[in-house]
């Protein structure tokens, strides 16, 4: 009798690493004539979510789905929901109005596993008072799960407002991709890098990262009045910092790379580029640019909400991204 495949064995790419690479996406869109933006659209293609002006504020809309990164169906459902919803928080939404579920399941996936994925998704939505109002489900060779999320904001923050002199904060450690990849390695290979207890710690921390909503972090940023913010996901810290640099017309310098313990050596062996800020993240932290004179206010706002953070860099005149920081294996998350 054949062994039942786990969720992660049903896909070749996992979590936000299944996203089309950043450069490939940019090349693809160059050949597409999109309808002109206008009317009520304040922010369109190129940010974490679209922003549409309505009476009394702004509707924030995003869609996000991906393949499994965790073998447990319920946990995977929670991660998928959190990753979908975080995009609207990263634009300043203070309320999630609705979620439409996007799902695809292989024929060989047991119905109970699919149901557990959906239950995890629903429970994570409940944690941030997000109502599921519908969805669409297809048969698909790889399992996929995510959602189209609609939020509301009285004001919004884009990725493109960073200014020279700003300092940068990150609200979660990096390293989800190598941490979860360790689960898929043959035991004899994995033990070259991590003991059983180290693996358990790394995976547990990665799950904490991937299921922690950005709601409190975003509320703190809005309270202080930050210049720019974005969530760190499939393009990695360097890629999303690059989006901030390009959209803002500035240079971003990364001086510190806080990571989940044990993931740096794994990343070097597997070629993920975590030590260069290039490793894909799934449902990662909020990257925030704030004027240096308001940095202490932001730290205070984070601490009052029990939001973990690190000051990781600064914004200069110029262009592009420079990663010159040392890796820090964090011991205080969450």
Curated annotation (Swiss-Prot):
InterPro entries from the UniProt entry: PurM-like_C_dom, PurM-like_C_sf, PurM-like_N, PurM-like_N_sf, SelD_I, SPS/SelD
Catalytic reaction list: hydrogenselenide + ATP + H2O = selenophosphate + AMP + phosphate + 2 H(+)
Ranges in a coiled coil: none
UniProt keyword list: ATP-binding, Kinase, Magnesium, Metal-binding, Nucleotide-binding, Selenium, Selenocysteine, Transferase
GO annotation, biological process: selenocysteine biosynthetic process
Cofactor note: Binds 1 Mg(2+) ion per monomer.
Secretion signal, residue range per the UniProt entry: none
Top-level EC class as recorded in UniProt: transferase
Active site: 16
Site, as annotated: Important for catalytic activity: 19
Domain of life from the UniProt record: Archaea
Protein name (database record): Selenide, water dikinase
Species: Methanopyrus kandleri (strain AV19 / DSM 6324 / JCM 9639 / NBRC 100938)
